[in-house]
Amino acid sequence: MQESQDTHMSSHLDEVVAAVSVTSKNRIPNKLLQTALFQPPREKLHLCEERAKSYSSSREYKQAIQELVRCVALTRICYGDWHWKLAEAYVNLAQGYLQLKGLSLQAKQHAEKAKEILANSIESPCHNKTDIFKCSLELFYTLGRALLSLQKFKDASENLIKAERLSKEMLQCGNIVKEEWIEIQSRIKLSFAQLYQGQKRSKEAFPFYQKALEYTEITKDEKSLECVQVLRELAGVEQALGLYAAAISHFSRDRLPTPQPCPLGHKCCCPSPFLSPVLNVTWRPFYSSQVDEEEAHLIILSKDPSPEEAADSAHFIARAAAASGMHDHRDVAEKYFQESMTSIKDSEGAERAKFLSIQDEFCSFLQTTGQKERAAMILRESLEAKVGAFGDFSPEVAETYRALGRADLAQGNNSGAYAKLKKCVQIETFLYGSQDKKTLATQHTIDTLSKISEAAGKSRQSVKAKVAFCTSAPQYGMPGKGRHSVAD
């Protein structure tokens, strides 16, 4: 039995040596093999950390996660089970799962493991506590982000508050410099903004987005890609707030100095470093959501984007302009819808599906602006492409038939509407079943059209019968009088 185990162990070691000693093409020289096998753990740890950073920056996320896992194992070998360095390795792994792969639950579990290690870690009195404080700060921040992604808003808020409080204490004690504190604040403020917005509390989110943008512009530059995310989310909050045009206009007229020229050419703008009586935060013009989107778009275009990135950026502006509901913004919305679609018009696969989705939004925009015939024409032309991209029995094709049916109804073409809605309900029955709300609603419309058609048919038959009766009935003269002839 012992001999069998020894043989198995020997075989396993041979496999390990073979795996280490052979690259994808050539065998590593013996000297390098010995270096790889007998390299001290701390040197291996340092190499793994560097490789994790390299893979992350080159967007090779799977390899980056693998290196972070190795870092945890090597840190345990180097420092033991209850050293703060192991907690730091778990925090880095949690950040990797959260930021690189979007796996919030795994990130939460690793962050909680790091918290447990820090709570039980044993350090010598002479050890510099700054590194431990920084590790704790990143732990609270990462755990807060993970809980936010899991929509556990109360727990997320508690951890973000701890991170913010600790960062202020570290700044006051000289553990971090002001520039480092501002960078930390930009992340924390953005997280708080997203936390409030995730609960549909746009009013509370608004000032945090403004602070996040301010700090991000200081640390990353105004034209950085990091600013794009904040600008877009800020624009979304401004739209959700309803814009408050009347209140802002009144405040502008009574309180503010001469307005500065609006970058879009409007005459409704005024300087921003003032407090709005509506929101009690730094005021931004009512069209500012669109301004933010255009700023973000210019940043994207300056970075030599791919067609997909350019399309996404233009699409954001089109949505912002369309959502404003203002007549002056219609041309802007159409311009950026067209720009977005042009960027990916000839794409295939997933991007082709994105093009068709944007095209549908554009058609909805055209319908709301009274261009219903143009919208219907585009939808009719898109049917073949949608069948090719999504299949005959797909939600996208069903919705297109529904929209075309409604367009025919609006034009009084009941027979055309009936035919298109009939196709729509067939697809919906296949996708969702005959008792689904969508299917039942479409079927109800079809039944109503059928009744109208039947009623119209009966009415026509009745009219024809009356006409036939009147023309075939004999013409009798008055009693005692003969008919008058032409001669008479």
Swiss-Prot record:
InterPro entries: TPR-like_helical_dom_sf (IPR011990), TPR_rpt (IPR019734), TTC23/TTC23L (IPR042621). TPR repeats lie at residues 45-78, 137-170, 186-219, 228-261, 398-431. It holds the Pfam family TPR_8. GO terms for cellular component: cilium. Keywords: Cell projection, Repeat, TPR repeat. Disulfide bonds: none annotated. GO terms for biological process: positive regulation of smoothened signaling pathway. It is found in: Cell projection, Cilium. Its main location: other. Participates positively in the ciliary Hedgehog (Hh) signaling. Associated with the EvC complex composed of EFCAB7, IQCE, EVC2 and EVC. This is Tetratricopeptide repeat protein 23. The lineage of its organism: Eukaryota, Metazoa, Chordata, Craniata, Vertebrata.
